[in-house]
Amino acid sequence: MASYFDEHDCEPLNPEREARNNMLLELARRVRGAWSWAPGSRSLFNRMDFEDLGLVDWEHHLPPPAAKAVVESLPRTVIRSSKAELKCPVCLLEFEEEETVIEMPCHHLFHSNCILPWLSKTNSCPLCRHELPTDDDSYEEHKKDKARRQQQQHRLENLHGAMYT
């Protein structure tokens, strides 16, 4: 049996290509609007913010650091005898009884001097990659867009599946 797209001689939506096309159109609009021959005008590229244009490809860059307020608010947990045999996944040293450690939202435990340098570089748990919020607005917007695209793709797959059941 032919697929819906074969029957109607059309291509499925490609959110990445659509986003890239929209980004290029926006770049062209900004280039046209930013170009100025007025005396004292600055360089075209000094006037444009490539992050605002969405030209930072977060899929191929490391995520930004975790938000400072979020890191400071992570719960500190005191190790009790029942958890004393656990080890810090970064330094592999066993936690000592009555030692204070940092607990991530994913419930992984770390020594503060092991996890804090990590979170100053990236926003995720080193074990499971659970992401913490960042102070980078463009990255947060990228995460929301990615979730919307995944939801749209899921709805499209459900719709397509419902047509043939």
From Swiss-Prot:
Protein name: E3 ubiquitin-protein ligase RNF181
Sites bearing Phosphothreonine, chain numbering: 165
EC number annotated for this UniProt entry: 2.3.2.27
CC terms in the record's Gene Ontology section: cytoplasm
Chain's gene name: Rnf181
UniProt key word Transcription: no
Species of the source: Rattus norvegicus (Rat)
GO molecular function: ubiquitin protein ligase activity; ubiquitin-protein transferase activity; zinc ion binding
Transmembrane segments: none
PANTHER family linked to this entry: E3 UBIQUITIN-PROTEIN LIGASE PRAJA, E3 UBIQUITIN-PROTEIN LIGASE RNF181
Role: E3 ubiquitin-protein ligase which accepts ubiquitin from an E2 ubiquitin-conjugating enzyme in the form of a thioester and then directly transfers the ubiquitin to targeted substrates. Catalyzes monoubiquitination of 26S proteasome subunit PSMC2/RPT1.
Catalyzed reaction equations: S-ubiquitinyl-[E2 ubiquitin-conjugating enzyme]-L-cysteine + [acceptor protein]-L-lysine = [E2 ubiquitin-conjugating enzyme]-L-cysteine + N(6)-ubiquitinyl-[acceptor protein]-L-lysine
Class in the EC hierarchy, top level: transferase
Keywords, alphabetical: Metal-binding, Phosphoprotein, Transferase, Ubl conjugation, Ubl conjugation pathway, Zinc, Zinc-finger
Region ranges (Disordered): 136-165
